[in-house]
Each structure stands twice: as C-alpha cells, then as structure tokens.
Amino acid sequence: MMNRLLVFLMLGAAFMLVVSANDAYGDEPAFKDLNQGDESLGKRKSCCPCWLRGNCFWGQNCYPEGCSGPKV
C-alpha cells in the first residue's frame, strides 16, 4: 500500500515540475500580470501548449511556443 502511495506522489510531483517548467518558459509574464488591463496579455491567458496535442481545456487555443506563439 505504501509503495502505491509513494508512486502516486512521485507522479504528482513530476507532473507539477513539468507544469511549472512550462510556466517559466521564455519571457512569459507571471499569472498575476495576465489579470491586469492589457488586452494582449488577457488573450494570452486562454491558451495552452501544443504538446498537449490540441487537447486544450475550457476552449483554450493551442500555441506551438507557449502563449506567445502563433495560434494553431
């Protein structure tokens, strides 16, 4: 039982590392900056990386290079 729990926790930690590494990619602004009045930043909030193979959630758009790349 402990082995399964440990594997589950390690997979969760690996997933969080991937997500945080993707958030830190390039010169992307912090999430709190996306909620401010700049319209271009607001549009970038609803996007997802294309390594999800287009399986974006909540109607997001897929961008090849983070949120700043051209929409796919």
Curated annotation (Swiss-Prot):
Pfam family name, one: ATX_III
Matches recorded under InterPro entries: Neurotoxin_3_Anemonia, Neurotoxin_3_sf
GO CC list: extracellular region; nematocyst
Signal peptide bounds: 1-21
GO molecular function: sodium channel inhibitor activity; toxin activity
Keyword terms, alphabetized: Disulfide bond, Ion channel impairing toxin, Nematocyst, Neurotoxin, Secreted, Signal, Toxin, Voltage-gated sodium channel impairing toxin
Major subcellular site: secreted
Similarity comment: family membership: Belongs to the sea anemone short toxin (type III) family.
This protein's name: Delta-actitoxin-Avd2b 1
Organism whose genome encodes this protein: Anemonia viridis (Snakelocks anemone)
